[in-house]
Amino acid sequence: ISAAAALAAPTLALAQARPIRLVVPYAPGGPIDVTARLMAERVKDSLGTVIIDNKPGGGGNIGADIVAKAAPDGLTIGIAAVATHAINPWLFSKMPYDAAKDFAPITQMLRVPNVLVMNADTATRLKINTLQDLIAYAKANPARLNYGSGGNGSAGHLAGEMFKRDAGIFAVHIPYNGGNPAQLALLSGQ
């Protein structure tokens, strides 16, 4: 965060007169959104007001494209992620931006791990207590399990597909419009 503040110093006078728009290409409430909000609060004394603008959709492409096409005045910055800059160029035949040329990096804010979790009530009902139990259940009950992710092509989606391949199981992928909606569906037993 300190590095982000230092790199943004040339726009400090302008940023204090007008707010900085921080585009988050994912749904509100997810880990990247929460991190962006914490960062905005942390830098407000040195950079002025930072407004979070969530623009989910297209695996992050909608928000990233807004940043790519913004005026280069330092007042619009964005969160880049694995999906927007490493995965999507391989998934989409026509990208609205060039991930390598249309952005200038500021700093790495965080690393987000992929975690495999299951609704506790469902796990109890199916007698799944370990990863081995989950794999055994999936093999004995093909196509009975679903898994959710923050969207098609997201890191969670690709991690789920790799897990299925490596475990030799099948589960139906349910893409959500962001990690937070996927988490809410999980907690509610969907």
Regions found by a protein language model. Give the residues of each.
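Oxidoreductase and adenylate-handling cofactor-binding alpha/beta cores
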Residues: 131, 157-170
